[in-house]
Protein backbone atom coordinates (compact mmCIF):
# COMPACT_ATOMS: atom_id res chain seq x y z
CA UNK A 1 0.00 0.00 0.00
CA UNK A 2 1.20 3.50 -0.88
CA UNK A 3 1.95 5.71 2.15
CA UNK A 4 2.16 9.51 1.82
CA UNK A 5 2.76 12.36 4.25
CA UNK A 6 -0.05 14.32 2.60
CA UNK A 7 -2.90 12.96 0.51
CA UNK A 8 -5.07 15.48 -1.37
CA UNK A 9 -8.46 14.58 -2.80
CA UNK A 10 -9.49 16.59 -5.86
CA UNK A 11 -7.29 18.35 -8.41
CA UNK A 12 -9.27 21.50 -9.03
CA UNK A 13 -7.52 24.81 -8.48
CA UNK A 14 -7.63 24.41 -4.67
CA UNK A 15 -6.22 20.87 -4.76
CA UNK A 16 -3.52 21.87 -7.24
CA UNK A 17 -2.55 24.80 -5.03
CA UNK A 18 -2.41 22.58 -1.93
CA UNK A 19 -0.25 20.03 -3.74
CA UNK A 20 2.07 22.66 -5.19
CA UNK A 21 2.66 24.35 -1.84
CA UNK A 22 3.11 21.01 -0.05
CA UNK A 23 5.81 20.07 -2.54
CA UNK A 24 7.47 23.45 -2.03
CA UNK A 25 7.77 22.47 1.64
CA UNK A 26 9.36 19.16 0.59
CA UNK A 27 6.41 17.09 1.79
CA UNK A 28 5.81 13.64 0.32
CA UNK A 29 2.44 14.39 -1.27
CA UNK A 30 0.06 12.90 -3.82
CA UNK A 31 -3.10 14.47 -5.22
CA UNK A 32 -5.85 12.20 -6.54
CA UNK A 33 -8.39 13.32 -9.14
CA UNK A 34 -11.52 11.30 -9.98
CA UNK A 35 -11.74 12.56 -13.57
CA UNK A 36 -9.33 11.90 -16.41
CA UNK A 37 -8.47 15.60 -16.59
CA UNK A 38 -7.24 17.91 -13.82
CA UNK A 39 -8.51 21.44 -13.18
CA UNK A 40 -12.04 20.97 -11.89
CA UNK A 41 -14.13 24.02 -12.75
CA UNK A 42 -11.10 25.81 -14.27
CA UNK A 43 -10.47 23.01 -16.78
CA UNK A 44 -11.59 23.37 -20.39
CA UNK A 45 -12.71 21.21 -23.29
CA UNK A 46 -12.66 21.37 -27.08
CA UNK A 47 -15.30 20.78 -29.74
CA UNK A 48 -14.34 20.76 -33.44
CA UNK A 49 -11.38 23.09 -32.91
CA UNK A 50 -13.25 25.45 -30.54
CA UNK A 51 -12.15 25.73 -26.89
CA UNK A 52 -14.60 26.31 -24.03
CA UNK A 53 -14.06 26.81 -20.31
CA UNK A 54 -16.38 25.23 -17.76
CA UNK A 55 -18.57 28.36 -17.54
CA UNK A 56 -17.24 31.91 -17.60
CA UNK A 57 -13.79 32.44 -16.05
CA UNK A 58 -11.87 35.72 -15.91
CA UNK A 59 -9.25 36.74 -13.36
CA UNK A 60 -9.54 40.01 -11.46
CA UNK A 61 -7.60 39.09 -8.34
CA UNK A 62 -5.89 41.84 -6.38
CA UNK A 63 -3.85 39.40 -4.31
CA UNK A 64 -0.18 40.04 -5.06
CA UNK A 65 0.94 36.45 -4.55
CA UNK A 66 -1.79 35.03 -6.80
CA UNK A 67 -0.90 37.66 -9.41
CA UNK A 68 2.75 36.58 -9.22
CA UNK A 69 1.66 33.05 -10.18
CA UNK A 70 -0.99 33.91 -12.76
CA UNK A 71 1.07 36.63 -14.42
CA UNK A 72 3.70 34.11 -15.50
CA UNK A 73 1.16 33.32 -18.21
CA UNK A 74 0.82 35.84 -21.04
CA UNK A 75 -2.66 37.32 -20.79
CA UNK A 76 -5.13 39.64 -22.49
CA UNK A 77 -6.56 42.53 -20.45
CA UNK A 78 -10.27 43.25 -20.89
CA UNK A 79 -12.57 45.98 -19.61
CA UNK A 80 -15.36 44.36 -17.55
CA UNK A 81 -18.14 45.55 -19.86
CA UNK A 82 -20.97 43.17 -19.07
CA UNK A 83 -24.42 43.56 -20.61
CA UNK A 84 -27.93 42.28 -20.00
CA UNK A 85 -30.61 41.29 -22.46
CA UNK A 86 -34.27 41.78 -21.61
CA UNK A 87 -37.08 41.44 -24.16
CA UNK A 88 -34.77 42.23 -27.04
CA UNK A 89 -33.16 45.25 -25.35
CA UNK A 90 -29.46 45.31 -24.52
CA UNK A 91 -28.75 47.17 -21.28
CA UNK A 92 -25.34 47.72 -19.75
CA UNK A 93 -24.72 46.01 -16.41
CA UNK A 94 -25.71 46.90 -13.72
CA UNK A 95 -29.18 47.63 -15.03
CA UNK A 96 -30.16 50.16 -12.35
CA UNK A 97 -27.37 52.47 -13.54
CA UNK A 98 -28.16 52.02 -17.23
CA UNK A 99 -31.91 52.52 -17.70
CA UNK A 100 -31.48 54.69 -20.83
CA UNK A 101 -32.85 52.10 -23.34
CA UNK A 102 -36.14 51.79 -21.41
CA UNK A 103 -39.22 53.88 -22.20
CA UNK A 104 -40.12 56.91 -20.10
CA UNK A 105 -42.88 55.17 -18.12
CA UNK A 106 -40.55 52.36 -17.10
CA UNK A 107 -37.84 54.80 -16.03
CA UNK A 108 -40.27 56.84 -13.93
CA UNK A 109 -41.63 53.72 -12.24
CA UNK A 110 -38.16 52.39 -11.37
CA UNK A 111 -36.79 55.74 -10.16
CA UNK A 112 -39.88 56.59 -8.06
CA UNK A 113 -39.76 53.17 -6.49
CA UNK A 114 -36.07 53.59 -5.69
CA UNK A 115 -36.70 56.94 -3.99
CA UNK A 116 -39.55 55.39 -1.98
CA UNK A 117 -37.66 52.18 -1.17
CA UNK A 118 -38.30 50.75 2.31
CA UNK A 119 -35.96 51.46 5.17
CA UNK A 120 -35.56 48.16 6.97
CA UNK A 121 -33.09 45.64 8.33
CA UNK A 122 -33.26 42.90 5.67
CA UNK A 123 -33.99 39.40 6.96
CA UNK A 124 -33.47 37.77 3.56
CA UNK A 125 -32.17 38.49 0.07
CA UNK A 126 -35.59 39.61 -1.19
CA UNK A 127 -35.82 42.31 1.47
CA UNK A 128 -32.20 43.29 0.81
CA UNK A 129 -33.03 43.86 -2.87
CA UNK A 130 -36.11 45.92 -2.01
CA UNK A 131 -34.12 47.97 0.48
CA UNK A 132 -31.35 48.61 -2.05
CA UNK A 133 -33.31 49.20 -5.26
CA UNK A 134 -36.99 49.69 -4.42
CA UNK A 135 -39.84 47.32 -5.25
CA UNK A 136 -40.06 48.11 -8.97
CA UNK A 137 -36.40 47.54 -9.88
CA UNK A 138 -36.00 44.66 -7.44
CA UNK A 139 -39.00 42.72 -8.75
CA UNK A 140 -38.33 43.41 -12.42
CA UNK A 141 -34.65 42.48 -12.53
CA UNK A 142 -32.63 40.91 -9.68
CA UNK A 143 -35.51 38.93 -8.17
CA UNK A 144 -36.42 37.32 -11.47
CA UNK A 145 -32.74 36.64 -12.19
CA UNK A 146 -32.26 35.09 -8.74
CA UNK A 147 -34.64 32.23 -9.57
CA UNK A 148 -32.71 31.51 -12.78
CA UNK A 149 -29.24 31.64 -11.21
CA UNK A 150 -29.79 30.27 -7.71
CA UNK A 151 -32.80 28.04 -8.33
CA UNK A 152 -34.67 29.56 -5.37
CA UNK A 153 -36.87 32.57 -4.77
CA UNK A 154 -34.99 35.49 -3.24
CA UNK A 155 -36.80 35.29 0.12
CA UNK A 156 -35.35 31.80 0.62
CA UNK A 157 -31.77 33.09 0.40
CA UNK A 158 -29.73 34.73 3.15
CA UNK A 159 -27.62 37.85 2.60
CA UNK A 160 -24.30 36.54 3.91
CA UNK A 161 -22.89 35.80 0.44
CA UNK A 162 -23.40 39.25 -1.12
CA UNK A 163 -20.23 41.13 -0.14
CA UNK A 164 -19.22 43.34 -3.08
CA UNK A 165 -20.91 41.12 -5.67
CA UNK A 166 -23.99 43.36 -5.93
CA UNK A 167 -23.70 47.06 -6.79
CA UNK A 168 -25.40 49.31 -4.24
CA UNK A 169 -27.68 51.85 -5.87
CA UNK A 170 -26.99 55.61 -5.78
CA UNK A 171 -29.55 58.16 -6.98
CA UNK A 172 -27.04 60.22 -8.99
CA UNK A 173 -25.85 57.14 -10.88
CA UNK A 174 -29.42 56.01 -11.55
CA UNK A 175 -30.48 59.42 -12.90
CA UNK A 176 -27.39 59.81 -15.09
CA UNK A 177 -27.85 56.33 -16.55
CA UNK A 178 -31.53 56.98 -17.23
CA UNK A 179 -30.96 60.30 -19.02
CA UNK A 180 -28.08 59.31 -21.27
CA UNK A 181 -26.10 56.32 -22.43
CA UNK A 182 -23.16 55.92 -20.07
CA UNK A 183 -19.81 54.19 -20.45
CA UNK A 184 -18.88 54.19 -16.75
CA UNK A 185 -17.56 51.00 -15.20
CA UNK A 186 -19.66 50.09 -12.16
CA UNK A 187 -18.35 46.56 -11.91
CA UNK A 188 -16.42 45.38 -8.84
CA UNK A 189 -13.19 45.10 -10.86
CA UNK A 190 -11.43 47.47 -13.23
CA UNK A 191 -9.70 44.82 -15.31
CA UNK A 192 -10.42 41.24 -16.35
CA UNK A 193 -7.48 39.05 -17.37
CA UNK A 194 -7.53 35.96 -19.54
CA UNK A 195 -4.70 33.82 -20.97
CA UNK A 196 -3.74 34.69 -24.52
CA UNK A 197 -3.57 31.01 -25.42
CA UNK A 198 -4.90 27.77 -24.00
CA UNK A 199 -7.94 28.84 -21.96
CA UNK A 200 -8.28 29.86 -18.31
CA UNK A 201 -6.48 26.74 -17.05
CA UNK A 202 -3.21 28.15 -18.42
CA UNK A 203 -3.00 30.37 -15.34
CA UNK A 204 -2.33 27.25 -13.23
CA UNK A 205 -0.99 24.79 -15.80
CA UNK A 206 2.62 25.48 -14.81
CA UNK A 207 1.84 24.61 -11.20
CA UNK A 208 -0.19 21.54 -12.11
CA UNK A 209 2.62 20.15 -14.25
CA UNK A 210 4.95 20.32 -11.25
CA UNK A 211 2.49 18.47 -9.00
CA UNK A 212 2.25 14.77 -8.24
CA UNK A 213 -1.28 14.10 -9.48
CA UNK A 214 -2.95 10.82 -10.38
CA UNK A 215 -6.08 11.02 -12.53
CA UNK A 216 -8.97 8.55 -12.76
CA UNK A 217 -8.72 7.95 -9.00
CA UNK A 218 -12.16 8.26 -7.43
CA UNK A 219 -12.10 8.06 -3.64
CA UNK A 220 -14.92 5.80 -2.41
CA UNK A 221 -14.00 5.34 1.26
CA UNK A 222 -12.04 7.18 3.93
CA UNK A 223 -11.09 5.15 7.00
CA UNK A 224 -10.12 7.78 9.55
CA UNK A 225 -9.04 5.31 12.23
CA UNK A 226 -6.54 3.63 9.90
CA UNK A 227 -5.81 6.81 7.90
CA UNK A 228 -6.59 5.05 4.64
CA UNK A 229 -8.30 6.13 1.42
CA UNK A 230 -9.79 3.47 -0.87
CA UNK A 231 -10.32 4.17 -4.58
CA UNK A 232 -12.83 2.78 -7.06
CA UNK A 233 -10.09 0.89 -8.92
CA UNK A 234 -9.41 -1.20 -5.81
CA UNK A 235 -6.19 0.55 -4.81
CA UNK A 236 -5.64 2.31 -1.51
CA UNK A 237 -3.26 4.78 0.09
CA UNK A 238 -2.38 5.68 3.65
CA UNK A 239 -1.82 9.22 4.81
CA UNK A 240 -0.49 11.20 7.72
CA UNK A 241 -2.45 14.31 6.72
CA UNK A 242 -5.55 14.40 4.54
CA UNK A 243 -6.67 17.45 2.55
CA UNK A 244 -9.96 17.39 0.66
CA UNK A 245 -11.43 19.73 -1.92
CA UNK A 246 -14.35 17.36 -2.50
CA UNK A 247 -17.84 18.77 -1.95
CA UNK A 248 -18.78 18.37 1.71
CA UNK A 249 -21.81 16.13 0.99
CA UNK A 250 -19.60 13.84 -1.11
CA UNK A 251 -16.79 13.72 1.44
CA UNK A 252 -19.07 12.91 4.36
CA UNK A 253 -20.79 10.17 2.37
CA UNK A 254 -17.50 8.24 2.00
CA UNK A 255 -16.16 8.65 5.55
CA UNK A 256 -16.46 5.37 7.41
CA UNK A 257 -18.71 5.62 10.49
CA UNK A 258 -19.52 9.28 9.90
CA UNK A 259 -21.99 10.33 12.65
CA UNK A 260 -25.65 10.59 11.63
CA UNK A 261 -25.85 14.22 12.78
CA UNK A 262 -22.96 15.14 10.49
CA UNK A 263 -24.35 13.15 7.56
CA UNK A 264 -27.73 14.83 7.95
CA UNK A 265 -26.11 18.27 8.05
CA UNK A 266 -24.07 17.48 4.93
CA UNK A 267 -27.11 16.11 3.09
CA UNK A 268 -29.04 19.29 3.90
CA UNK A 269 -26.56 21.45 1.98
CA UNK A 270 -27.83 22.42 -1.46
CA UNK A 271 -26.07 23.67 -4.55
CA UNK A 272 -26.63 24.43 -8.21
CA UNK A 273 -25.75 22.22 -11.12
CA UNK A 274 -24.86 23.70 -14.51
CA UNK A 275 -25.80 22.66 -18.02
CA UNK A 276 -23.40 24.25 -20.50
CA UNK A 277 -24.68 24.85 -24.02
CA UNK A 278 -21.69 25.69 -26.22
CA UNK A 279 -22.09 26.97 -29.77
CA UNK A 280 -19.64 27.43 -32.61
CA UNK A 281 -20.50 29.96 -35.33
CA UNK A 282 -19.35 30.18 -38.91
CA UNK A 283 -18.88 33.94 -38.61
CA UNK A 284 -17.21 36.51 -36.36
CA UNK A 285 -19.86 39.21 -35.85
CA UNK A 286 -21.60 38.10 -32.65
CA UNK A 287 -22.56 40.58 -29.87
CA UNK A 288 -19.29 42.22 -28.70
CA UNK A 289 -19.69 41.37 -25.02
CA UNK A 290 -17.40 39.25 -22.87
CA UNK A 291 -20.48 38.03 -21.04
CA UNK A 292 -24.13 38.96 -20.60
CA UNK A 293 -27.00 38.22 -18.23
CA UNK A 294 -30.31 36.93 -19.58
CA UNK A 295 -33.52 38.19 -17.95
CA UNK A 296 -36.04 36.68 -20.36
CA UNK A 297 -37.91 34.00 -18.42
CA UNK A 298 -38.56 31.88 -21.51
CA UNK A 299 -34.81 31.66 -22.15
CA UNK A 300 -33.64 28.90 -19.81
CA UNK A 301 -30.07 30.23 -19.62
CA UNK A 302 -29.15 32.73 -16.92
CA UNK A 303 -25.87 33.89 -18.42
CA UNK A 304 -23.74 33.59 -21.52
CA UNK A 305 -20.17 34.46 -22.41
CA UNK A 306 -18.04 34.48 -25.53
CA UNK A 307 -14.87 32.36 -25.47
CA UNK A 308 -13.79 33.88 -28.79
CA UNK A 309 -14.06 37.42 -27.37
CA UNK A 310 -12.00 36.39 -24.35
CA UNK A 311 -9.29 35.19 -26.73
CA UNK A 312 -9.26 34.59 -30.48
CA UNK A 313 -7.22 31.46 -29.68
CA UNK A 314 -10.46 29.84 -28.47
CA UNK A 315 -11.95 29.60 -31.97
CA UNK A 316 -10.65 28.82 -35.46
CA UNK A 317 -9.85 31.80 -37.66
CA UNK A 318 -12.96 33.53 -38.97
CA UNK A 319 -15.22 31.77 -36.45
CA UNK A 320 -16.73 32.74 -33.08
CA UNK A 321 -18.39 31.12 -30.10
CA UNK A 322 -20.81 31.51 -27.20
CA UNK A 323 -21.53 29.39 -24.17
CA UNK A 324 -24.84 29.56 -22.29
CA UNK A 325 -25.14 28.56 -18.63
CA UNK A 326 -28.35 26.93 -17.38
CA UNK A 327 -28.56 26.51 -13.60
CA UNK A 328 -30.65 24.02 -11.68
CA UNK A 329 -31.03 23.17 -8.01
CA UNK A 330 -29.28 19.98 -6.88
CA UNK A 331 -32.48 18.72 -5.26
CA UNK A 332 -34.39 18.83 -8.56
CA UNK A 333 -34.43 16.37 -11.46
CA UNK A 334 -31.83 16.89 -14.17
CA UNK A 335 -32.88 18.99 -17.12
CA UNK A 336 -33.36 17.37 -20.52
CA UNK A 337 -30.32 18.19 -22.71
CA UNK A 338 -32.27 18.00 -25.99
CA UNK A 339 -34.87 20.46 -24.68
CA UNK A 340 -32.12 22.79 -23.45
CA UNK A 341 -30.38 22.75 -26.82
CA UNK A 342 -33.65 23.44 -28.64
CA UNK A 343 -34.50 26.32 -26.27
CA UNK A 344 -31.12 27.99 -26.71
CA UNK A 345 -31.21 27.51 -30.48
CA UNK A 346 -34.62 29.17 -30.73
CA UNK A 347 -33.48 32.06 -28.52
CA UNK A 348 -30.31 32.58 -30.56
CA UNK A 349 -32.44 33.11 -33.64
CA UNK A 350 -34.96 35.32 -31.78
CA UNK A 351 -32.16 37.52 -30.40
CA UNK A 352 -30.80 37.95 -33.91
CA UNK A 353 -27.39 36.63 -32.92
CA UNK A 354 -27.19 34.30 -35.90
CA UNK A 355 -29.07 32.49 -38.63
CA UNK A 356 -29.56 28.74 -38.46
CA UNK A 357 -27.07 28.28 -41.30
CA UNK A 358 -24.34 30.05 -39.30
CA UNK A 359 -24.48 27.51 -36.45
CA UNK A 360 -21.71 24.93 -36.84
CA UNK A 361 -22.62 22.92 -33.74
CA UNK A 362 -24.47 23.08 -30.43
CA UNK A 363 -22.80 21.04 -27.68
CA UNK A 364 -24.07 20.07 -24.23
CA UNK A 365 -22.02 19.39 -21.09
CA UNK A 366 -23.26 18.80 -17.55
CA UNK A 367 -21.47 19.99 -14.40
CA UNK A 368 -22.74 18.27 -11.26
CA UNK A 369 -21.52 21.14 -9.03
CA UNK A 370 -21.75 24.82 -9.95
CA UNK A 371 -22.24 27.00 -6.88
CA UNK A 372 -23.06 26.54 -3.21
CA UNK A 373 -26.47 27.94 -2.27
CA UNK A 374 -26.86 30.22 0.74
CA UNK A 375 -30.28 29.23 1.97
CA UNK A 376 -31.25 30.23 5.50
CA UNK A 377 -29.17 28.74 8.34
CA UNK A 378 -26.80 27.07 5.87
CA UNK A 379 -23.80 28.33 7.84
CA UNK A 380 -24.92 26.55 11.02
CA UNK A 381 -25.35 23.26 9.16
CA UNK A 382 -22.05 23.74 7.35
CA UNK A 383 -20.30 24.38 10.66
CA UNK A 384 -21.50 21.04 12.05
CA UNK A 385 -19.72 19.35 9.15
CA UNK A 386 -16.55 21.46 9.34
CA UNK A 387 -16.24 21.01 13.11
CA UNK A 388 -16.46 17.25 12.70
CA UNK A 389 -13.87 17.18 9.91
CA UNK A 390 -11.55 19.30 12.01
CA UNK A 391 -11.99 16.89 14.93
CA UNK A 392 -10.78 13.98 12.77
CA UNK A 393 -7.92 16.03 11.29
CA UNK A 394 -9.25 16.37 7.75
CA UNK A 395 -8.53 19.76 6.24
CA UNK A 396 -10.82 21.07 3.52
CA UNK A 397 -10.29 23.67 0.82
CA UNK A 398 -11.86 25.29 -2.20
CA UNK A 399 -15.39 26.37 -3.07
CA UNK A 400 -16.93 23.01 -2.24
CA UNK A 401 -14.49 21.93 0.46
CA UNK A 402 -15.10 25.07 2.50
CA UNK A 403 -18.62 25.35 1.04
CA UNK A 404 -18.32 29.05 0.26
CA UNK A 405 -18.84 31.41 -2.67
CA UNK A 406 -15.17 31.43 -3.69
CA UNK A 407 -13.75 32.86 -6.88
CA UNK A 408 -10.79 31.03 -8.40
CA UNK A 409 -8.15 33.13 -6.60
CA UNK A 410 -9.88 32.54 -3.27
CA UNK A 411 -9.93 28.79 -3.96
CA UNK A 412 -6.23 28.97 -4.81
CA UNK A 413 -5.48 30.70 -1.49
CA UNK A 414 -7.74 28.25 0.35
CA UNK A 415 -5.69 25.32 -0.95
CA UNK A 416 -2.43 27.03 -0.03
CA UNK A 417 -3.69 27.76 3.49
CA UNK A 418 -4.29 24.08 4.24
CA UNK A 419 -0.54 23.57 3.91
CA UNK A 420 0.53 26.77 5.64
CA UNK A 421 -1.69 26.19 8.68
Protein language model regions, located:
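Mid-domain catalytic core of redox enzymes
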Residues: 25, 218-322, 326-338, 346-352, ...
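Short loop/edge segments at beta-strand edges and connector loops
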Residues: 77-79, 215-218, 398
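Glycine-rich FAD pyrophosphate-binding loop
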Residues: 23-46
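Active-site/ligand-binding neighborhood in enzyme catalytic cores
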Residues: 107, 112-227, 238, 245
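Dinucleotide-binding Rossmann-like beta1-alpha1 core, especially the glycine-rich loop
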Residues: 48-120
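Conserved Rossmann-like nucleotide-cofactor binding loop
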Residues: 14, 37, 249
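Conserved flavin/dinucleotide-binding core of flavoenzymes
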Residues: 44, 309-421
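N-terminal Rossmann-like FAD-binding beta1-loop-alpha1 element of flavoenzymes
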Residues: 4-31
